[in-house]
């Protein structure tokens, strides 16, 4: 199921994001070359992984705070990709040139399935944006309980079809 859950989850969160920013959906519909960048911007804006848990393997000090070996740390992926210190603008913009996001982790903890998730999602965004003109909520979405990973359980939408 690696890659499949991420793709399903990220597409659901992506549709929710495009509903919130309809001008960006129009931008994607009008310029398919933005699909890959749109996926990265969706991961930056609303990643499926909201935090990762790590354990300190040695004592260290970070920004004046002492962290003891064995301490459990929760690293907020969402904030790392939206912090104005690291990003020029927190605004959702699928045409923006951004620094690398951490939606798939980093270093030795980088998701091995990220190529699959990205390629599948870009293909899906291209297909969906080709035939879905206007997307809106049809009812309230329900999300997984807050657990470090998130995804719509239900996402009732309605849309105009472009044939």
Task: Describe each PLM feature range.
Residues 1-163:
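Cytochrome P450
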């Amino acid at each position: 199921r690696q890659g499949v859950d991420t793709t399903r989850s990220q597409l659901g969160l992506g549709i929710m994001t495009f509903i919130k920013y309809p001008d960006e959906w129009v931008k994607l519909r009008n310029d398919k070359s933005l699909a890959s960048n749109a996926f990265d911007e969706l991961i930056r804006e609303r990643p499926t992984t909201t935090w990762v848990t790590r354990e300190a393997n040695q004592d260290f000090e970070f920004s004046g705070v002492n962290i003891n070996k064995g301490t459990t740390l929760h690293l907020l992926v969402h904030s790392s990709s939206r912090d104005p210190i690291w990003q020029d603008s927190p605004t959702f913009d699928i045409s923006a040139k951004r620094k690398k996001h951490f939606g798939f982790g980093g270093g030795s903890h980088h998701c091995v399935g990220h190529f699959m998730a990205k390629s599948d999602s870009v293909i899906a965004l291209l297909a969906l944006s080709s035939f879905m003109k206007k997307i809106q909520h049809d009812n309230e979405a329900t999300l997984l309980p807050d657990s470090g990973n998130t995804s719509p359980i239900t996402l009732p939408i309605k849309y105009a079809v472009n044939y």
